[in-house]
Amino acid sequence: NEADRMTHIVQDLLTLSKIDYGKMEMNISRFSFAKAISNVYEAARLNAEQNHHHTMLFHCEDDIPDVMGDRERIEQVVMNIVSNAIKYTPDGGKIEIYAGSSGKSVFVRVTDNGIGIPEKDLPRLFERFYRVDKARSRESGGTGLGLSIAREILSQHKGEIKIDSVYGEGTDVRITLPAAPPEK
């Protein structure tokens, strides 16, 4: 509803303000990346399956290294990406979450067979307040701030986000973070 949408916008603006002024507090600790991604999957799955009739799959490699960071913020970023996949995939679509590691990094990929993003819009996705399709975003509650916030949070964790998409076919989002050094 409109009250929830306005609350979400205010929360996003407060988060951006904290980022801009270096006031965003991070609760840094060692945590299981695999467990964090599993938490996001479990939290999103019910909505995806019951409200949108999506097939939602989760694959997780064995022995993914831990991460040093703010678990809540990382889960917030991944939930934003998964929520976008749910919102912009027509009912009955498929969303996959894949967590793994490569070298000294961990990653999560979120892929969907949704509506995709036009190629001309890809370079602007991380701009504040940029929305690919304003009517579509307004209908689904988009503010144009989520991806900007996600990139800022990941940057503070020395991580990155990459988005590939084909309009009409779907989107592939990859988040990469440095793995924590092995415990002694």
Name each model-derived stretch.
Residues 33, 116-127:
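Short helix N-cap motif at coil->helix boundaries in the Bergerat
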Residues 27-32, 55-65:
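Conserved catalytic submotifs in the C-terminal HATPase_c
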